[in-house]
Amino acid sequence: MNSELFSPYTIKDVTLKNRIVMSPMCMYSSENEDGQVTNFHLIHYGTRAAGQVGLVMIEATAVLPEGRISNKDLGIWDDSLIEGLHKTTTFIHDNGAKAAIQLAHAGRKAELETDALAPSAVPFNETMKIPVEMSIQQIKNTILAFQQAAVRSKQAGFDVIEIHGAHGYLINEFLSPLSNKRTDEYGGSPEKRYRFLREIIDSINEVWNGPLFVRISANDYHPDGLTVQDYVQYTKWMKEQGVDLIDCSSGAVVPARIDVYPGYQVQYAKHIKEHANIATGAVGLITTGAQAEQILTNNEADLIFIGRELLRNPYFPRIAANELGFELEEPYQYERAPGKISTNK
C-alpha cells in the first residue's frame, strides 16, 4: 500500500526517507552543566533513528551559554562542543536517518544565575526575573553567535538547521509586540521587529547552504499579540531569504490559556502553506499514523513533527506503518522480529 507518510521528501540536496520528524524537545541532560552531549543523548536520539524516523532533530541547542533555558541544556557556543554533537549525528546516520539541530537562545526565559537578556525589560510573568534590555552590541554579538553555531553545525555533520523562533524565546520575543517595546531599528513596526531574525537568517546563509527551517509560534493567544495572519507576512519574508520550511507551533510568548486537542496546530501549518506558499511542518498532539497520513493527503503540511508520541514509543514509525498497511523496511538487526507491533497503549 502506498503512503504519503512513508514517501521520501527532498529539500535541496537532502532526501528524507519518510515525512516523520522527531520534534525538538529539551532533555535537560547535560549533567555537568557544560553544554556537552552525554551518553543519554546518544541513546535517546539513536533509538529514534533506529525506530525509522526520517529526520531526527536535536533539542534546542544554545548558541551562547547565557542563552540556555537551564544550565543542563545542550550547547554549541564553543568548538569543544562539536565532538559530542558529531558522535550524535554519526549515530543517527548509521541508523538510516538524517540529522537536524535546532539553534536557540532562551532570551528572557533563561533560568540561570546570570542576567536574562531580551529585546525589552519586560518579564514573562510576575514570578520570573526582569530581563535586561539588549544593547545594539549585544544584538550583533548574538547574531554572530547564531552564525558561528551554523558553522559548527556543519562541522558536526548535521543535514538540516532549524532556527528556534517560537515559544517565547529570544527571537519570538523580538517578533511579538507583547515582548518587544523597543523604539529603535529593532522594534516598532513589523519590519523592524523582524529585523533581528532577518539578520540571523542572512548571517546563517553566509556559511550554510543546506536546508534551513524556522520554528514559529503562529498565534500569541492574546488580543494584542500576533496571529497566524501576521505570520503570513513574516513567513513570506523568510521565504524570500531562502528559508525552506516553516515548523508551525504556537503560544508561550506570554502566559495564555490554550485550547489543546489532537492536531490543534495543524490549522497554522495549512494556513501558512496556502498563503505564504512555503513548505510547512505540522506539530502538536499528532499521535497516530492515520492522523499524520490525513494531514499530508489533505495537503495541510509537508512534514509531520512528532514529539510526545516519540517519547512514549521510539518505534512509532513502525506502529504507524502497521496501522496504514505499509511495509516498512526493518533495520537488519531487527529482522528476526517481523510482523505487527501492538498499538495498545
From Swiss-Prot:
One of its GO terms (biological process) is response to toxic substance. Pfam families: Oxidored_FMN (PF00724). Keywords: Detoxification, Flavoprotein, FMN, NADP, Oxidoreductase. InterPro entries: Aldolase_TIM, NADPH_DH_bac, OxRdtase_FMN_N, YqjM-like. It catalyses: A + NADPH + H(+) = AH2 + NADP(+). It comes from the Bacteria. This is NADPH dehydrogenase. GO terms for molecular function: FMN binding; NADP binding; NADPH dehydrogenase activity. The keyword Heme does not apply. The gene is namA. Substrate binds at residues 28, 164-167. SUPFAM superfamilies: FMN-linked oxidoreductases. It is an enzyme of class 1 (oxidoreductase). FMN binds at residues 23-26, 60, 102, 215, 307-308. Transmembrane segments: none annotated. Homotetramer. Belongs to the NADH:flavin oxidoreductase/NADH oxidase family. NamA subfamily. It comes from Bacillus thuringiensis (strain Al Hakam). Its cofactor is FMN. Its EC number is 1.6.99.1. Catalyzes the reduction of the double bond of an array of alpha,beta-unsaturated aldehydes and ketones. It also reduces the nitro group of nitroester and nitroaromatic compounds. It could have a role in detoxification processes.
